[in-house]
Amino acid sequence: MSRKHIASEALLKNIQVPQGDKTYEKILDAGLALFVEFGLRRTTMEDVATRAGIGRATAYRRFADKDQLIQVVILRECQQQLAMIESDLEKVDDGLERVLESFVLAVTRAHRHPLLKRLLTSEPETLLPLLTQRLWQMMGFFRIYLAGLLQVEQDNGAIRQQPMEPM
């Protein structure tokens, strides 16, 4: 697996995102915008549907409930952030340096992300349960991403061989 596709592969193993469904994308975009603006608690599915320019029933046909929408929005944001990190890493030649830089970039981007900043300032009590209980897929996503990144660097001889299975 090339470095360019690690994030996409990790995401696809954890959640099925319909490709080319413009309405689905509009719902995700509206959800993200409203979650950043008003927080998770204050945003309703009706708010999201209105912002997306669709009916509430259409939103519910694509997402069973707000929790599912939250999960998909966050997973999509993770995938997009990791894709940007992978793009930045293309400029780094040394494999070990690439692994270290990936961690630095991930932490930096996380601290600057508007949704994470919103949750930390207005709903900190929801963040830990969200990440550990409701977004268990995200842990799998990061595990697959990290294992893929390390495997590529092992294959390139940049870091020593270790089995990735424990990850």
Each language-model region and where it sits:
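Short hydrophobic/aromatic patch on the recognition helix
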Residues: 53-63
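Basic, helix-initiating cap at the start of DNA-binding domains
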Residues: 1-38, 42-51, 67-71
